[in-house]
Regions:
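C-terminal nucleotide
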Residues: 2-29, 54-87, 184-331, 346-386
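Gly/Ser-rich oxyanion-binding loop with an adjacent helix/lid
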Residues: 2-24, 30, 34, 39, ...
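Short Gly/aromatic-enriched secondary-structure transition segments
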Residues: 41-48, 226-227
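Short, charge-rich binding segments
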Residues: 46-48, 56-59, 105
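Short, amphipathic alpha-helical segments that act as regulatory/interfacial helices
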Residues: 49, 98, 136, 231-234
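FabD-like malonyl-/acyl-CoA
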Residues: 130, 342-346
Length: 386
C-alpha cells in the first residue's frame, strides 16, 4: 500500500543518507454536490478521502531542498533563495509552498524529502492540492512551530497554484485537504468562507467514482464562457436589484423578471446555478436526518442540470449516469468541472458488484475502453503520521 509509512520510508532511506525523518500525509477530495457554484458566491460540499499524498521530510542543515518523487522516479534540487521555479511540474508545487511559507514568516531551511501518492492524476480528486497541503503542513510543523493556522495553510496551496503553476483555482480543494474530517463533509460558503461539518456515514451505502478516462480539450474556454454567462445574468438582475453581488443572491423569481434582458443561453446557465446552490442546502438538511435517498435524488438532479442546462457533461458521462439510474443506484452525477473525468455514485451495498460489473462491461462495449473504478471513504485532513 502506497500510503503506508514503510513504503515511503524504505525509499527515503535508500535515496538519501540512510536516516529517517518525519512523515506527513494529506488527502485528495470529492465534492458531493455544489458544482460551478464557487465562482457564483455559493456553497460547495467537499469531503477529504482515503487517498492522497504521503511524504517523508527531514531538515538537512543546508539551504537546499532535495526532493524525490517516488512515483515518477524523478529527483530535483533547488536553493531556497532561487527565484526561478524548477522545470519539473511536480517540483513546482514543493518550490511554491516553500516560497509561500517564507512569505508568511516561516523560516524554511533546506530539507530532504521523498513522496508518493495514490490519488489518481486527472480523475478530479485534486492530487495537486493533496501535495501542497502535505508540504504546507510539514513546513509549518518543522520550521514554523505550527504557528500558521489551518485556513492560511489552505491559502498557501491556493497561492502556489496561482503563482507557480498558472492555475487560477478557488480554495475548495486545498480547504478540503486541510480541514477534512473522518465521517464528515464540509459545507463551505465560498463568499464568507465560513464552513460547517455535516455527518456523512452512509451505513449500507458505498461511495464510488467511475472514471470515464476522457478529457475533452474544450474545458478551459468553455469554463470561462460559463463564468461570463453567470456575470451577464447578474448584471441584468442588478438593474432591478442593485444589492445583488452574485447569483447566490438571486432566486428564480428574480431571474424570471429579468428574462427579457438575458440571452436564452445565459438564462439556462443561471437557472442551473440558482437551483444547484439550493440543492446543496437541501442535501445538508437531508444528511441531518440520515435521508440518503433524498441525497441521491439531488445528485441526479445536479447531473441533469449540468448536462441539459449548464451543458458541461459529455456522451460518456451521460452514459454512465443513465447506466447508474437503470441499475437502481441511489445517486449519480458528473463530478468536477465536467467535459470528462468521473461520475460520483452513492450505491447500496447489495447493488455494488452488479453496478460495477455492468458499468465496466457496458462502457467498454460502447466506447471500446474500460472505465476506472475508485471506492472512496471520507477521511481526515492533513496530519503528521510519525
Amino acid at each position: 500500500n502506497i500510503m503506508d509509512i514503510e513504503y515511503v520510508r524504505s525509499r527515503f532511506i535508500k535515496h538519501f543518507d540512510g536516516t529517517t525523518g518525519a512523515v506527513y500525509a494529506s488527502p485528495g477530495r470529492i465534492n458531493l454536490i455544489g458544482e460551478h457554484t464557487d465562482y457564483n458566491g455559493g456553497f460547495v460540499f467537499p469531503g477529504a478521502i482515503d487517498k492522497g499524498m504521503i511524504a517523508e521530510v527531514k531538515p538537512n542543515g543546508t539551504n537546499t531542498v532535495k526532493a524525490y518523487s517516488i512515483d515518477l522516479k524523478d529527483y530535483v534540487e533547488f536553493g531556497l533563495n532561487e527565484e526561478d521555479a524548477p522545470r519539473a511540474s511536480w517540483a513546482r508545487y514543493i518550490f511554491g509552498v516553500c516560497r509561500e511559507m517564507i512569505k508568511r514568516g516561516v523560516e524554511v531551511k533546506g530539507f530532504n524529502t521523498a513522496f508518493a501518492g495514490d490519488v489518481p492524476l486527472g480523475a478530479g480528486m485534486s492530487s495537486s492540492a493533496a501535495l501542497e497541503s502535505t508540504y504546507a503542513y510539514a513546513l509549518n510543523d518543522l520550521f514554523g512551530d505550527n504557528k500558521i493556522d489551518k485556513f492560511e495553510l489552505a491559502k498557501v496551496g491556493q497561492a502556489t497554484e496561482h503563482n507557480y503553476c498558472g492555475v487560477n483555482c478557488g480554495i475548495m480543494d486545498q480547504f478540503a485537504s486541510v480541514f477534512g474530517k473522518k465521517g464528515s463533509l464540509i459545507r463551505l460558503d465560498c463568499r464568507s468562507l465560513e464552513y460547517q461539518y455535516f455527518p456523512f456515514e452512509p451505513k449500507g451505502y458505498r461511495l464510488v467514482l467511475v472514471d470515464s478516462v476522457v478529457k475533452h480539450e474544450l474545458a478551459s474556454s468553455a469554463y470561462n464562457k460559463r463564468r461570463q454567462s453567470c456575470e451577464a445574468a447578474v448584471a441584468a438582475i442588478q438593474k432591478k436589484h442593485p444589492h445583488v453581488e452574485f447569483l447566490r443572491d438571486c432566486n428564480m423569481e428574480m431571474l424570471e423578471e429579468a428574462k427579457a434582458d438575458i440571452s436564452a443561453e445565459d438564462f439556462m446557465r443561471a437557472e442551473y446555478v440558482i437551483e444547484e446552490i439550493q440543492r446543496v442546502l437541501d442535501v445538508c438538511d437531508a444528511l441531518e436526518k440520515s435521508d440518503y435517498e433524498t441525497v441521491g435524488q439531488k445528485m441526479y438532479e445536479t447531473h441533469h442540470g449540468m448536462s441539459k442546462l449548464y451543458e458541461v457533461s459529455c456522451e460518456e458521462l451521460d452514459f454512465l449516469n443513465d447506466l447508474a439510474f437503470d441499475c437502481g443506484v441511489t445517486g449519480s452525477r458528473v463530478m468536477g468541472g465536467g467535459f470528462g473525468g468521473c461520475t460520483i455514485n452513492l450505491v447500496k451495498e447489495e447493488l455494488y458488484s452488479t453496478f460495477i460489473e455492468k458499468a465496466k462491461e457496458e462502457f467498454k462495449k460502447k466506447f471500446n475502453r474500460s472505465p476506472k473504478i475508485y471506492d472512496v471513504v471520507i477521511s481526515d485532513g492533513a496530519r503528521r503520521l510519525e
